Amino acid sequence: MPYFIDMYNKAELVIVPSERMYQRLVEEGLTVKKYVVQKMWDFNVHMDLHTPSFERKLYFLGDVSRFPFFQNWQYDTPLHAFGNHNSDYDYSKVHFGGWLNKTELLLELSKGGFGLVWGNQEDPKDEKVYYKMNCSYKLASYLSAGIPVIVPDYLSNADFVKEKGIGFVVSSLEEANEMIQNCTEDNYNQMVTNLKHVQYLINNGYFTKKLFVDTIMALD
């Protein structure tokens, strides 16, 4: 960390994924006073996606081998994943869609369901610290596709999800399953409607453009 802090301290301004990250860097020795918070990733999407339909299923993006919960998925909500998986484990409760490029992936996600953002649970304490400071790329992927999300209550963007009404903020996978099973079609469609504006912003580079403008203004 000292190497990076020394490098950052040569800058006039730093761009951080969250407010908590800036505070952590200050604790590590950062002296730069000017900073801008990223908040969200963008996608450049120039195609028509589906309007999500109500389905009680979860999508997950990531290297399955790094996430133990795949190995004993026993919930009523079907779990769908993309990419390769280790044949040494029993994934009978998980549906694998194979590898898809960005265009194919967004089209598939946009058909309906929920997007899951979750940690690998290898070190629960460090995981919470990481997600409190990190800006989740998975979250932006699901929102870009226009589907509601399931996120842990310690995620840096959890308040954003709750305030916008674009998904469920939960404390466990058990609660995630319960929320989806109790969700009605009307509830789901309302979340999809709430998501339209956020989806438009992400798919048209709003957050990156705002980041540049905020940076220039802060340096002026």
Question: What is each of the regions a protein language model found here?
Answer:
Residues 1-6, 43-44:
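Nucleotide-sugar donor phosphate/pyrophosphate-binding loop at the beta->alpha transition
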Residues 4-5, 9-34:
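A short, active-site helix/loop in glycosyltransferases that binds the activated sugar's phosphate group
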Residues 20, 40-41:
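Carbohydrate-associated surface elements
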Residues 20-22, 65-66, 156-157, 175:
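Alpha-helix capping/helix-boundary segments
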Residues 41-110:
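Conserved catalytic-core segment of nucleotide-activated headgroup transferases in glycan assembly
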Residues 103, 107-144, 151-159:
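Nucleotide-sugar-dependent
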Residues 164-170:
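A short acidic/histidine/glycine-rich donor-binding loop in glycosyltransferase catalytic cores
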Residues 171-174, 178, 185-218:
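A charged, aromatic-enriched C-terminal amphipathic alpha-helix characteristic of glycosyltransferases
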